[in-house]
């Protein structure tokens, strides 16, 4: 590991120790955090300081393919705060109230798999007090997977209106103005057969042309056909026979009486 000293007004304030790597992987079975400790930092730098900060490129136990290390190992070290990189979503460990390990994530989501707010943590260390980590949103564009229930939409125009309403609702909870959406249409609807690839692409372009701050990269049609039992009963085909048999079976169950066993 490498070590550095952070000073304020000429006085030692924090020892910083860390390790990363330049290749695509870290040797299996080697603990990337080994040697990153207050004791080693003091020995290497020849000075003591109130705080010790560790910096690691690790997947912890979240991604076992990238220099994994168990969080309990880091928490057992005499290190006040671990700043970790690799996981692209913000995360605090062991709890948000006592965040001794933090992934800031990446400052900008890169694709639809990196949804939600992205930014950095502003961390405050105070002697005798828990670590304080405040999330600061930095992303200029936020990705969002948006499920839209269109079961009550009688027309394609209504579907478009429902999508726009859902976009604004999602934006109200976002940390920035511009958003990219992956829209998933759900619900049982009579429009199911009409929502083919061409119609979905026309919908996407129409919504994208309406609001410059929102962009839909794709719309997935995951709707289904409504199941009308009464209509099936009147058709006289196999579904009607099946439903009739099911009704008779349920009637038979209702006639069964199970009495309590007689105790001797």
Indicate residue ranges for each PLM-predicted region:
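His/Asp/Glu-rich metal-coordinating catalytic cores
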Residues: 1-124, 130
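Accessory, non-catalytic peripheral segments of nucleic-acid enzymes
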Residues: 130-255, 259, 263-264
